[in-house]
Amino acid sequence: MIRAAIKGSGSALPRKVVTNEELAARVDTSDEWIVERTGIRQRYIAGADEFTSTLAMEASRKALEAAGITPETIDLIVLATATPDNTFPATATKVQEALGCNGCIAFDVQAVCSGFLYALATADSLLKTGMAKRALVIGAETFSRILDWEDRTTCVLFGDGAGAVVLEAAEGDTEAPGILASRLHADGAQHDLLYVDGGPSTTQTVGHLRMRGREVFRHAVVNLADVLKEVLDDAGVSASDIDWVVPHQANARILDATARKLGLPMEKIVVTVDRHANTSAASVPLAFDTAVRDGRIKPGDLVMFEAMGGGFTWGASLVRY
């Protein structure tokens, strides 16, 4: 059977770090308030010369280097973002041009914080059809550009960044590296719980992020538990078989709840929310690359990715690294 295996990963962060103390000087909040409710201690914020595309390019170059392959061998680029450089063309085409992957398929997907899971499943499907042999799957965001910096309930939660993986199609059995199972879902009836109040078709403005946090949390815990069970059932494995869970880094409380639902110790959960905050579509690949590079995630490990975002959208993928 054809399997899409992760051959390398990379990530990128803006230069500027913003601490909770610095935010407390701007809005009515404190380090203690933010840490207690979210687990976040700092975040990275893009400068005037840093964009979703430039972060994506840096993460992609590192992923290609880690995979030991050259850009011209990439057949497909799928970039997940809710904060593209432009309404069009796709930010993926900017990455394609910068890397020199001339002529390859390149497009964006938009599923907010679930975007990387949607992009990964899309690339996996295209590789299995034979339409492409190697793919770059990227999650990249500059969420700082759509935040209301007067709203302390949301501006403290998010940061900017990018993560990328190289996928390669190869024959393999269930023990070989590759994506074992994926599930995606959406529920548009909940769109007004997490959204941006602007857009080119409605207000002709970018708008700002709006969120009803308690309701989002309640839905997230249930939806993520359900989709994780679906993926485990599809793959024919149990939660105890998982070596690592790489969740969307929304906040520490959701990460704790996910671990409890799976019956896993927090030691098996990759946590970067304290350093990176919520980087939306970049969150999962950024956390994955962090854990690969610091030696936690090793070849052969069984890794679960999961995320939920505005829409609502949510999904999970089980990967043999």
Curated annotation (Swiss-Prot):
Annotated region ACP-binding: the residues are 249-253
The written remark on domains in the entry is:
The last Arg residue of the ACP-binding site is essential for the weak association between ACP/AcpP and FabH.
Matches recorded under PANTHER family: 3-OXOACYL-[ACYL-CARRIER-PROTEIN] SYNTHASE 3, BETA-KETOACYL-[ACYL-CARRIER-PROTEIN] SYNTHASE III
Gene Ontology terms: biological process: fatty acid biosynthetic process; secondary metabolite biosynthetic process
Sequence similarity: Belongs to the thiolase-like superfamily. FabH family.
| Descriptive protein name | Beta-ketoacyl-[acyl-carrier-protein] synthase III
- Protein biosynthesis as a keyword of this entry, yes or no, is no
> How is this protein organized at the quaternary level?
Homodimer.
Spell out the catalytic residues.
113, 248, 278
State whether keyword Iron applies. no
**Primary localization:** cytoplasm
Q: Which organism is it from?
A: Erythrobacter litoralis (strain HTCC2594)
UniProt entry keywords in alphabetical sequence: Acyltransferase, Cytoplasm, Fatty acid biosynthesis, Fatty acid metabolism, Lipid biosynthesis, Lipid metabolism, Multifunctional enzyme, Transferase
Pfam families hit by this protein: ACP_syn_III, ACP_syn_III_C
Q: Name the Enzyme Commission number(s) assigned to this protein.
A: 2.3.1.180
Tell me the organism's taxonomic lineage: Bacteria, Pseudomonadati, Pseudomonadota, Alphaproteobacteria, Sphingomonadales
What EC class does the entry list?
transferase
Q: What does this protein do?
A: Catalyzes the condensation reaction of fatty acid synthesis by the addition to an acyl acceptor of two carbons from malonyl-ACP. Catalyzes the first condensation reaction which initiates fatty acid synthesis and may therefore play a role in governing the total rate of fatty acid production. Possesses both acetoacetyl-ACP synthase and acetyl transacylase activities. Its substrate specificity determines the biosynthesis of branched-chain and/or straight-chain of fatty acids.
